[in-house]
Amino acid sequence: MAAYAGPTSVSFQPDEDVMTAHLENWFGECMEGEIDIGWSDPITGGIKSFKRFDVGDFDEAATFAARVNAIPGQSVYFRPAVIRLGSKRYVTDDDAQYVPGVWCDMDDEGAAEKARTIYSTCQPTSVVVTGRKPYIRAHLYWKFSEPVTAGS
């Protein structure tokens, strides 16, 4: 990713209530494990770090995510899989405990605009627009009726 070259201050803030609702919708049926909130470095554009929260601490995770996302140029996201308790700082697929559903990132130019033709027969449970400049980017989520044990 390229370094951030946008404004250094903004007049709006992330919506913590929407973040809480999205985390609760996605992880609400998961009873154990942890949620990873990650964020990018506005200087390099690369992943800076992760902070882990109990899978039921939606408010705390959203408060943290909103605070991090309020810094211009610093993107925040969550890992859509529940991480096994006691996992090391940097995880791999083997550290996933549950997956509440399937998801995809539409981060390439033009992908979000074409998505409707791709999912016309199977609408996603939720869509998050992750950016609009220089082009629209989105994440699509299809939630299962219950979480699936990772690797099964």
Name what the model sees in each region.
Residues 1-101, 113:
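DNA replication initiation on ssDNA origins
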Residues 87-94, 115-133:
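Catalytic micro-motifs at enzyme active sites that drive phosphoryl/nucleotidyl and oxygen chemistry
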Residues 88-92, 138, 142, 151-152:
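A short acidic (Asp/Glu
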Residues 99, 124, 135-137:
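A general structural motif
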Residues 102-104, 140:
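Detector for short helical micro-motifs
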Residues 105-112:
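Short, surface-exposed ligand-recognition loops at beta-strand->loop->(often short) alpha-helix junctions
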Residues 112-122, 144-152:
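Helical (often loop-to-helix) elements that flank the catalytic cores of nucleotide-handling enzymes
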Residues 129-143:
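Short, conserved phosphate-binding/catalytic loop or strand-edge motifs used
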